[in-house]
Design a protein with these regions (language model features):
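Catalytic cores of nucleic-acid endonucleases
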Residues: 1-8, 55-101
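Non-catalytic C-terminal interaction segments of nucleic acid-processing enzymes
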Residues: 5, 23, 43, 93-152
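Catalytic micro-motifs at enzyme active sites that drive phosphoryl/nucleotidyl and oxygen chemistry
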Residues: 29-30, 39, 79
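Alpha-helix C-cap/termination motif
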Residues: 24, 43-46, 81-85
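Beta-rich catalytic cores
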Residues: 36
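Conserved catalytic cores of phosphodiester-cleaving nucleases, focusing on short active-site segments
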Residues: 21, 40-42, 46-60
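Acidic-basic catalytic patches of nuclease active cores, encompassing PD-(D/E)XK
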Residues: 1-32
Length: 152
């Protein structure tokens, strides 16, 4: 969803997901500015330990899809952030049946289907964008953290 069309309800849901992740990972979530390429920074003891782009999908079940679409720009941003900051960068999707995540750097882009998707029912020329389809087998369901705090 474009940050320009994101609603307060969308932000509240994303914040709720960020708080759940932070509790599981023993961190503090910090929301970034609206135009940032990552939604949330995760801090522990005043140190950055991870970043995430979070999407909340209402009235949808993860199991009904064979893949999840990710904006190609979001993937680039997450991978670049991970390289620069040397912390894990995650793409997180919240569905009605759970919260699922994948570490961006583990996605082999050459094995993903690339397409152009978006809203075709709106007149704006900026409604479509390149996306990659990430197979469901790459996604992990939120669970207890490992010894380092994050499931790798």
């Amino acid at each position: 969803m474009s940050h320009l069309r994101e609603t307060d309800a969308d932000r509240r849901k994303e914040d709720e997901v960020a708080r759940l992740l932070a509790t599981t990972w023993n961190c503090e979530p910090i929301r970034t500015k609206d135009q940032s390429r990552v939604d949330t920074l995760f801090m522990r003891d005043k140190s950055l330990v991870a970043v995430a782009e979070i999407k909340a999908r209402r009235n949808r079940q993860f199991a009904t899809f064979s893949s999840v679409q990710l904006n190609l720009q979001n993937w680039f941003s997450l991978v670049q952030f991970e390289m620069a900051a040397e912390v894990p960068a995650f793409m997180v999707f919240a569905f009605d049946d759970g919260i699922y995540y994948v570490r961006a750097a583990t996605i082999q882009i050459g094995q993903c289907r690339l397409s152009v998707r978006g809203r075709t029912d709106r007149p704006g020329i900026d409604e479509r964008q390149p996306v990659i389809e990430i197979g469901n087998l790459l996604w992990k369901r939120l669970r207890e953290p490992d010894a380092e705090g994050f499931s790798r």
